[in-house]
A protein has these predicted regions:
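Amphipathic alpha-helical packing segments from all-alpha helical-bundle domains
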Residues: 126-132
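GST-like domain detector, emphasizing the conserved glutathione-binding G-site
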Residues: 1-126
Length: 132
């Protein structure tokens, strides 16, 4: 059985949906971002990046949404989550998933996590206002 570490309202939702879609046997473990659990030693032992999603499998630990989605699709080929028989089409799916994670998702990160970039409370507020 796999274990998915996630936080609500995060990009981990895509991995959660994929696992449900294929009927995978997994346990979902909430990482409490409100209490900085992602920065605690227990979670950092699992994922030193301190991010979600993290998928613990019998083969090892995977992080990053595109990697997890590709792994799930390849582990459950009959679910048809991705065009596994066509390398180019599969790469197009990977490109789209990477764009969502590295561009679209990140473009909104400043609203909720301005402290990653600046320490000045006024600058954090300005980033939040810019995102509205």
């Amino acid at each position: 059985m796999w274990t998915l570490y996630y936080a609500p309202i995060s990009c981990a939702l895509a991995s959660h949906i994929a696992l449900e879609q294929v009927g995978a046997s997994y346990e979902a473990v909430k990482v409490d971002f409100a209490n900085d659990a992602q920065r605690g030693p227990e979670y950092l032992r699992i994922n030193p990046k301190g991010r979600v999603p993290t998928l613990v499998t019998e083969r090892g630990i995977l992080t990053e949404t595109p990697a997890i989605l590709a792994f799930v699709a390849q582990s459950f080929p009959r679910a048809n989550l991705a065009p596994l028989d066509d390398p180019y089409a599969f790469a197009e799916v990977q490109a789209f998933n990477s764009y969502l994670c590295s561009t679209v998702h990140v473009a909104h990160a400043h609203r909720m996590r301005g402290h990653r970039w600046v320490d000045d409370p006024a600058a954090i507020l300005a980033m939040q206002e810019k995102g509205e």
